[in-house]
Amino acid sequence: FCSPLRQRPIDFGADLVVHSTTKFINGHSDVVGGAVIAAEAEVGEQLAHWANVLGLTASAFDSWLALRGLRTLDARVRVHDANAAEIVATLAGHPAVTAVYYPGLAEHPGHEIAARQQDSFGSMISFEVVGGLAGATAFCRGLQVFDIAESLGGVESLIAHPASMTHASMTPEVQLAAGITPALLRLS
């Protein structure tokens, strides 16, 4: 989950990039939208034409809200990144935490590619706690700053329990095959 400030796929040869304006770009959890960026100007013009013809554009107000967020994107992302680094350092050494998943950690399987392709390691953190579902529930209930919700990239500090929230429609077996355990939590 990188904003366009942290990773630019066109620099690595992508022809088109799709960004969610709902998340980091807007940053205030009050817009649903997206943007398609083309490497070639002609393709971008064709996309803009068809978006207009088909009515696939955001409302003027939603566009204004996204622009408002874009103006503060750099400042917000810098704070997100710094906060994530501090949280990861705390979680990595905590006895109640059994695993931390963050590309900024040298042992993360995506660390090398993230270091090559991104300007920072982002602000999305997943981790597992001791005690399975009961441990995850107790952890969430003890929080004072984070709210339990499914989202990311906004000004709110959020925690999610993927097994019972974002991935609840998957069977427990499929969840485990995807690395989603009852002890897994996600911070954003």
Residue ranges, per PLM feature:
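Conserved C-terminal alpha-helix-loop-beta "cap" of PLP-dependent enzymes
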Residues: A96-L185
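Conserved PLP-enzyme active-site core in the AAT-like
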Residues: F1-P95, Y101
